[in-house]
Amino acid sequence: MRRPFIAGNWKLHKTSAEAAALVGELKGALSDVVDRDIVVAPVFTSLAAVIATLEKSDISVAAQNCYPENQGAFTGEVSPALLKDAGCRYVIVGHSERRQLFAESDAFINRKVKAVIDAGLSAILCIGETLEEREADKTFDVLERQVRCGLEGLDAAAMEQIVVAYEPVWAIGTGKTATDSQAQQAHSFIRSLVNDIFGSKVAQQVRIVYGGSVKPGNVDGLLQQPDIDGALVGGASLNAEDFIRIVKFKAV
């Protein structure tokens, strides 16, 4: 049985004080939730405040990005080693906004994945198709390319440090959500790819989560699907009440 994984990606929101207040509320409300992994991903400038507030809590912290070198003349960048030193456990890699706004390639994303794993952190590898790609029936082609490129060079042991997040680009920040069956179909395909690359044991162990306008009103249906192991939550994670409800999803 795969342990559910719920992560909140705050993107470019929340001052340090606001971030600390939010996780303080989450820490109290979710202290009794012990059967799933809970993660928050604040902006870099709020990491210290969030990590300090979450001391003695089971809620983990992720960074939203990294650079795939540990040190050097890379002005403005942050390495996985420094993120680990700060107290992070996860790094989001390959988010569609990084791919689209900053032209990050599959090969560059693969470098990040390897760097995160080498630093002893876990990577949340984001993949997903655009609306144009879905309408052109290229969804599976895109997912296969992103999975194979993103995981290239990894072995079965490294896959223990990977969470795959399927985020259909057309459903991010648009209010649109993939139907339960659309999401399950994509997740099942992704798991079949992992099976093809690493074998059935890894495929059955790897967690594949859904991201794309996850809200309290749709999380229960999504998390009832057999291959959906959690959620990467965007806007709804900025509201304590909404995120708490999502973490406490009622899948049956």
Curated annotation (Swiss-Prot):
PANTHER family xrefs: TRIOSEPHOSPHATE ISOMERASE
Organism: Syntrophotalea carbinolica (strain DSM 2380 / NBRC 103641 / GraBd1) (Pelobacter carbinolicus)
Biological process, per Gene Ontology: gluconeogenesis; glyceraldehyde-3-phosphate biosynthetic process; glycerol catabolic process; glycolytic process
Compartments where found: Cytoplasm
Function: Involved in the gluconeogenesis. Catalyzes stereospecifically the conversion of dihydroxyacetone phosphate (DHAP) to D-glyceraldehyde-3-phosphate (G3P).
Keywords attached to this entry: Cytoplasm, Gluconeogenesis, Glycolysis, Isomerase
Keyword Flavoprotein: no
A molecular function (GO) term: triose-phosphate isomerase activity
NCBIfam families to which the protein is assigned, alphabetical: tim
Active site, UniProt feature: H95 (electrophile), E167 (proton acceptor)
Quaternary assembly: Homodimer.
Gene that encodes the chain: tpiA
Annotated positions binding substrate: N9, W10, K11, G173, S213, G234, G235
Recorded metabolic or biological pathway in which this protein acts: Carbohydrate biosynthesis; gluconeogenesis; Carbohydrate degradation; glycolysis; D-glyceraldehyde 3-phosphate from glycerone phosphate: step 1/1
Predominant location category: cytoplasm
Pfam families: TIM (PF00121)
Protein's UniProt keywords contain Cytoplasm: yes
GO cellular component, one term: cytosol
Protein's UniProt name: Triosephosphate isomerase
Family (UniProt): Belongs to the triosephosphate isomerase family.
